[in-house]
């Protein structure tokens, strides 16, 4: 998070100091082997953006992660052994006033073998005010209104899992 702040020319601790008690989530995801042609709408993980601040993703060598470029095309994100994929989430996009953009991505396992991935997502403290004006010259140039981290994350979580109700 320090590197993000430094690249924007703001206090290197601007984001870090808001992560004393961060909201963190982790997942291990299993994708079964595919032995037949996939339909156009069949996904391991449907197209989405990460709603939090920052996600670190490890994927095995099977592949299947695709990201959407600015032209709307899906591009394969080939696994590179010994590396992690760093995803900017929607919350960091808001906080940075769109300096950093969250990228739509999806997973389609087209292989006849199992696929695994692991992720860890970090967000600031629950009560942190996500205010893009910290990177703006003035409040009027902020693209988003301030919002509390926990309120935002819970609203996105509820939206994603609305079928629970």
Model-identified regions with their sequence ranges:
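C-terminal flanking tails of non-heme Fe-dependent oxygenases
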Residues: 1-165
């Amino acid at each position: 998070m320090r590197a993000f702040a430094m690249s924007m020319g703001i206090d290197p601790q601007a984001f870090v100091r808001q992560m004393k008690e961060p909201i963190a989530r982790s997942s291990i995801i299993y994708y079964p082997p595919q032995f037949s042609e996939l339909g156009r709408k069949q996904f391991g993980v449907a197209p989405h953006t990460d709603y939090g601040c920052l996600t670190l993703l490890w994927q095995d060598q099977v592949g299947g992660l695709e990201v959407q470029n600015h032209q709307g095309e899906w591009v394969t994100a080939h696994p590179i052994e010994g590396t992690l994929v760093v995803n900017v989430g929607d919350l960091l996009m808001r906080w940075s006033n769109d300096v950093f953009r969250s990228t739509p991505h999806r997973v389609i396992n087209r292989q006849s073998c199992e696929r695994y991935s692991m992720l860890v997502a970090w967000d600031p403290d629950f009560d942190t005010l996500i205010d893009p004006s910290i990177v703006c010259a003035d409040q009027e140039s902020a693209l988003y209104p301030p919002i509390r981290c926990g309120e935002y994350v819970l609203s996105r979580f509820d939206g994603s899992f609305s079928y629970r109700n």
